């Protein structure tokens, strides 16, 4: 917008409005003085409704204080007002007062008295840091001249030497240190001569006066010394001191203490104070420090110096910081006959920029001050020697002529200058090195003899160098005596040969004027600039600059004076190479809306650099091998696995066919011809050959004999989010290549956008979707069969019809983890597709296991992306290795699991699940070898073979356990049906299975069940701490067969060999795909480390909770003890009263007491008497008795060690009957979860029976303790009249028989004595008897692994191979009857694998923890759905007998390392907090 500029300001409304506004501001400023400024700022903020947080408010207040301290003092105000403003500027703690003779300013650090006579300031006295007042003539002169602002700034600078943040004691220590330092420096650094400044220990110290701090002058240049000597001065006066560099000492707050000396009259530093400050050495101007010097001072400095900028030491002093190579210098001696010196500087020391320009340095001890001054002198002299070369090589003359010069090669180092030149005696070298700090020595050496020509000559050169501090002046004495070879050169002083600029070389010259370094352009360049009148203005500074059109000079370029372009002396060669002028491209497409992948734009910066080098490398890569082409791509920021995938492609058949195969972009509808097409012409590259042209992305095509690419991605791990999903699913989109289009301006290596859910699909037609899924499965099946034919025999040995863990086609081998989706072909009919693969029929059209049909977080793209986007890899790649599959699947499945829980809200019908469950259980009885029944195959849409088997141990959520069982049975039935169809009708298409009367589950319910099956595959595998010891496949089959027998409702009939033969024949026709192996050793080691960390964290948490619980127990014990004491007192009083009665009344009272005790004991023994009855009655009665708790659940007892031996005898006397062992193997076939409402009517006998059996077959210690049957009973050691009744008949398998997996060799330490809780217990081997008492309520679920996350039992040992995910607690912990808990499962004797172990308790009283705490307890009790056996909640006597008979014996158990029993009856209880 152009605003008209009016000449007549009277009629310009804008000017009038501006004047009115300014006048309003002036009037407001007059009304608001400084004292009301803070109030007006606050009112202004409130009017604008802006509220400030506490931190911002402090910043505002600090800003106001700073402004108040630095506002200029009004010169027109009165003297009193000026002094008042002076006091306000010295800080908020200043007190201003008016006296008869003048004014007084009091501050904790300064005191100022100002005398006034006849309205004029007559005297001024100032005292700093508690010292007495002294006259301040400098301050008086400033006040008389009206320079109050300058006086305030000077006083503030002195006061700032002490930080305001330190405490009062630290401030006093700093003041003492200042006094001690002043005393030392005044004594040892009082000589102001130039010699003392350069050689003294501390140089020269100028003490502090009223206007400045003390200063230490440490170096003086010889040039300045010669000027003073010409004036007849040998000492530095005030005029010369202002020209010398100096340092000032102050203090700075630090987090570590420093040693500060204490002032004494003798001046000796014998005592020191510690204060959290460091000594700040402030330079008067920036000091150039090399990296070597900083390292040398690192052991005496407490923190790094305050750096203004990082530079290169030698380039910074030249004034031409852009020069990094080919630096040539020529001296400019004034006389015509003088021989010049031409230096060719080595470029090694010109590249790095690790030197600094420091403003402040810090010390931690005042005694290191002398060493710092010595180092600063040495650094200054080294810089002065290099500056002597630069200064003499400047010239103000513009003409060029030939001069005589000696060529010298100069190598720069921090400790020396190394010169090499030719003489008549051969090549000579000269070393100018620092023998001691600030003391340089010259040494010449002949290259022929290796010795110095003359030692006296070297001594003379050394004296000249130390007196002049000039290398060129010293070399003038050596050139004549050494007879150096002289060459004729042009007198261009400094020449920069820019090898990257091919047009011209920029020659610049140095000029010397008043010893100030100024860079001037050469006369030739000036004349060239005058001839060129054209000036180009560019909007984009950088790559858009065209160097041939931009020619200007600094001095006569008025248009660009002060602009950004004026800072460029010439165009950098980088901009010449990267310029895009003349090579413009069409505008890119607009990008999509930003999402969480927007940060991936940074990746395109590196890949954009490779586009300019693609034209030549593309042609070379087509002729080179494909591995070399992949290596080229690896250099262009591509992962190694990606490059290997690129290299696996074969040469294209014809570029024309490849170009014709890409009719549309990635977001268009495409029709795909049948069959596999060859890859495009430029397979290994992502960018087009010509960057100015855009090409459509071509799809990868497969030739008949071509192997698919080996892998994609990086390192076998996927990232997070939908970008990683796209990278896993469509990794071939980049690796298959084609001249890739860059749609929406995105980088080709960036993951695709987030996919939408299936509900947002563009074409949700079910018929088209099912047709597309069928075609997709046909393609997958085609190449999968072709690849796996050679592995059939090997995989046949790994499979068995009785082994549900190793199906013919597992979910882990499906496309969900590693295979990209093949392109959709909706226009092609099924019959035409089947004609190309006649021998392998496709599956049914509705494939619920298809990776493209699912939820948004699946490890592949959503269906929304599939019908629209072509897959660049029509030829599916080679399957990943098992290790890659494991890493690719683990994290994506966890992410998708939680996304699925949030998305799905529909719950399946319980009645429908029961119907399907009953049908599946009836079919399992008909077919003994195959649990799933073919009659249930029509109750749900058919599933692919990819999800036909129960996965490894997983966790389930509530009702999803039943869904997962139904899914597993139906998928196994479908797999069997597919095997029969493939063997009989191999030439025909797979028929659609008929539908039965039962309505099928909804697709989202089936998907949910299948997804929940797939969630924790890898987690369960990784949960074992001994994952490097893997059981063989045959070892896994045995426990599976045992578990299948125990889960059936009746003993399954044996299958005849004649029936097994057809099944084996069918298996030969089944395509075998290897099951995913366990992760490699490194991955297992990382998993073990992670599990150890989790275990340690949970152990710490348990210990904390144990401490809190111990405190609560202690308080409870104290309370109980007091209550018992009160009861004893009351009893004692009653006894005394009764003794006064007659003997006739005393006898009946004793009888009543005995009867009362007997009745209580009888109630306590009642569960044991009831257990002696029949099986069905005993469990119902036990459950009935458990419903009448009379005491708190805190008082449940845990058996102690000393009762184990006598219980061994009782258990041996009573052997279980055959009916109990047979009955223990029976389980209800239904796996549907029973709700609490339904569980009230369900029979509870199987639940308690299984819980009793779990007691027998849980861990590996020798005996079953008796007190598990009545653990509420107090531990009575010597009480023969009250013998407990014989224990009830044990149910379940015979004691000692463990039907788990056979691997006794992997179970060390399983036969330890009972009660040892300090070492982890591995899973029990067979033929080992009962659990220890402390493990009964700890790892009740058989903890599938050692990690705290994987403490649930393997899912394959539950009903239908499922498990629950709900964090359920035992029914007695929830305050419910035993039958109203989670569904009952079979005993845990079959729940172990050879490589699993049970986590031991982490504390001797660990049984008190985590009951009823679903958020803090260990996962073994949080996640397991099976409920442990409820403790017998029988009322205890009010006053239980105290165990006092064997106190020593009881105390002995507490000290042992292997003891796990409680310390007291109160500690031996099972704590269950009902929350």
UniProtKB/Swiss-Prot annotation:
Biased amino acid composition, Basic and acidic residues: 1052-1070, 1080-1148, 1155-1180, 1199-1215
Region of interest (Disordered), residue spans: 579-600, 645-894, 908-1475
Compartments, record wording: Nucleus
What keywords are annotated for this sequence in UniProt? Activator, Coiled coil, Nucleus, Transcription, Transcription regulation
- Main location, first listed in the record: nucleus
Q: Where is the composition biased (Polar residues)?
A: 755-766, 1181-1193, 1308-1317
List, as start-end ranges, the regions of compositional bias called Acidic residues: 810-819
Q: GO cellular component annotations, sorted alphabetically? A: nucleus
Subunit details? Component of the Mediator complex.
Query: What protein family does this chain belong to?
Result: Belongs to the Mediator complex subunit 1 family.
What is the protein's given name? Mediator of RNA polymerase II transcription subunit 1.1
- Organism this protein belongs to: Caenorhabditis elegans
Higher taxonomy: Eukaryota, Metazoa, Ecdysozoa, Nematoda, Chromadorea
Gene that produces this protein: sop-3
